[in-house]
């Protein structure tokens, strides 16, 4: 098999990275994708750094053994902790994801920018470096959201439980003063509609899925690795939990409008 026809690997701590996979498939409809969700060990955002590194390495090896030509680490926590190590250890294009703070700043709406993310993402040096670029001129507030990925892993993406969780998190803010909400975890786009409801649709909601997918396409094009055959690609999903329910949920989220 030529390298152009090999699949693209996607990895996340669970089902969250499917939000990025959806964007990538829209942008690269001829490509085949292999998605590995580590729901057995989710969430990563409250684990120790060394544990996240080991789990990420295991997932990467799983996908490498399936012959992928590129890897998207569709997990903010894993990106912040392991992306440099992965690029040193594997000789394929590796694309990570980080909170889309730059697009939020470039909107120039002038209000508060809230970054929803896991505690580990917000505690890592990679995030601190990102904050340093803008904190002098922008009103940016990190908002740790422990427990939210776990709800989404159970398939709870709407209804009273999600509404009340978000209502509690945003109760300290004046919705009129929020200009943007950055979704700093790939699980969060699945609760975007409820987030709009809680914040009365006042804020612009931004995630990094499109930017990451665009970077994937750019790197594949520059390396002459894009698939040339004119056909519709396919998506195959694996999960460390190895049960039908989590696979069914994964495909349901992938097909969610």
Curated annotation (Swiss-Prot):
Pathway(s) of this molecule: Cell wall biogenesis; peptidoglycan biosynthesis
Keyword field: Cell shape, Cell wall biogenesis/degradation, Isomerase, Peptidoglycan synthesis
Any GO MF annotation of the entry: glutamate racemase activity
Catalytic activity, as annotated: L-glutamate = D-glutamate
One Gene Ontology term from the biological process aspect of the record: cell wall organization
Keyword Cell wall biogenesis/degradation: yes
UniProt-listed Enzyme Commission number(s): 5.1.1.3
Residue positions binding substrate: 12-13, 44-45, 76-77, 186-187
Disulfide bond entries: none
Family according to the record: Belongs to the aspartate/glutamate racemases family.
Name of protein: Glutamate racemase
Native organism: Clostridium botulinum (strain Kyoto / Type A2)
Gene: murI
